[in-house]
Amino acid sequence: VFSFVSLHSRNVLKGPFSFTMALCVPENALRFKPSLTRTLMPRIQPRDAHFPTVQTLIESGVHPLLARIYAARGVRRREELDYRLSGLLPPHALHGATEAAQLLADAIEAGARMVIIADYDCDGATACAVAMRGLRSMGADVHYLVPNRFEYGYGLTPAIVELAARMEPELLITVDNGIASVEGVAAARRLGIATLITDHHLPGDTLPEADVIVNPNQPDCDFPSKSIAGVGVMFYVLLALRAEMRERSAFSNGQEPKLGDLLDLVALGTVADVVRLDRNNRILVSQGLARMRAGRMQPGVRALFAAAGRDAQRASSFDMGFALGPRLNAAGRLSDMSLGIECLITDDSARALNIAQELDSLNRERREIEQSMQEDALAQLNDFNPGDKLSACLFEKDWHQGVIGIVAGRIKEQLNRPTFAFAHGNDGELKGSGRSIPNLHLRDALDLVSKRHPDLLLRFGGHAMAAGVTIPEHRHADFSAAFEEVVQELLGGTDITRHIDTDGSLESAWMSLDAARMLEQEVWGHGFPAPVFSDKFRVDNQRLLKERHLKLQLSKNGQRFDAIQFNFAESAPAEIHAAYRLSANEYNGVTSLQLMFEHFEPA
């Protein structure tokens, strides 16, 4: 959801009803020139909730408000809201999971050394922690390696294989990477090292010749949950391994590993990686949240809640996506993701808290770097014409490679156009990170660019909404032109106006603290968004908090409400039409209802 807000915290309210509108992002404020802002103005539009479905859900015992929200998200039967573990898709349905279990069981029985090759984001870190904890619980001799992304690049490269070989492994296991590592797997094979690829990214035309590949998106895999995250794939491999070890009577004392204890990590990685929350993913997330709220979590997860100032007893998808996840990601962006992994695998609570506090400091540093880069990006967009351009490709020689993905995402949110941000890599290369909009599959677009310009893309990979690319240092302008050409073809004639989807007007009886708490307990995320409502209000009072957040007192149908819009430092008109969320706000030990505005406009 996108909002119109003022972007400079130093601005002050300019009179009772005057206001300036500009696009805002969740953390850092951005300002476009007024003509661009007007062109990019979004539209509030209600989702369609099929009335007979709403009635069916209500009759089956679903709360009327939730029934309306769920129906608008495609839920047809109450059974789809049953998030018990028994509802998970079976491990054998994931192509390669059974073979992976056999490979791992053989390695455990032989006492073979395994080395996990991890990715450097939250999904990769949680997948590595799940693998480390799960494999060790079944007796494996397992270690991990997460090479510096800036020195060794992404995936199982030949250089990483050479580095891992010093640890004398007999089996390399990738988590959240490896599906594009054709050369790396070949290098491991030459050294006599077996390879197990666990990944969820889209494969290229050629698969690596690994001993086993587990990836729901590989050819011949009919696993229904194509959106499972890398940590989810590894969790499924462990489920299959436990079943295999059970068949081999490896748990003769009856003490089977409790893999459910890893679901806090699975939930964290799933939400933070912004994969689509289909029912299978919602089960994983729901189970993880339930364990967090009950205090059953890894010491590192508990420490991350403390470092972020969040209450684990009220854990929500928001906490994982916007509080815990960014702190883990900060390690991979600015330092070494081994710091994040150590936080998740240590059983020492004091050590976990120390690491979490260090991660919090890194995240603060990341925000400062990001703010500077965003200012550079906006300067480059002074002459951007949304009437002519359907994409943006930005580059600055001093940009930090670990933060370009965030900047691309911020600018994409503002322009509602596919965006790449580039930074210097190694050996005369530029590293690019891209973010897309729903109408354009980013990896497919890159594949088309690659086929038309075979010498332009050195490497690329990713998903529909996010992708990475490496190009020669001097070819940025060529890439920008080639990418724009492909985007024009794929989006030509498509209405890409930004829309704020809402769940419509909220009845007065449900504008309550109880309703806010009820909604916070549910599972929300990408593809199953948290509810946003839209209503008209009268603004009775307004003031600035910390010179950057607009605090309002509103009235509607005789009721009064407190509301806030973050990163908004201009005044609201007397009558507004607002898109908002219900929030339980705690202040000085008192909890009350607060409306969190996503966007407002004159009524």
Located regions from the model:
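Mid-to-C-terminal polyanion-binding domains and interfaces
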Residues: D106-A110, R351-L394, D427, L440, ...
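A short acidic, amphipathic alpha-helical/loop segment
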Residues: E183-A187, A392, V407, M518
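Active-site cavity-forming subdomains of large catalytic enzyme subunits
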Residues: E162-V231, F235-S252
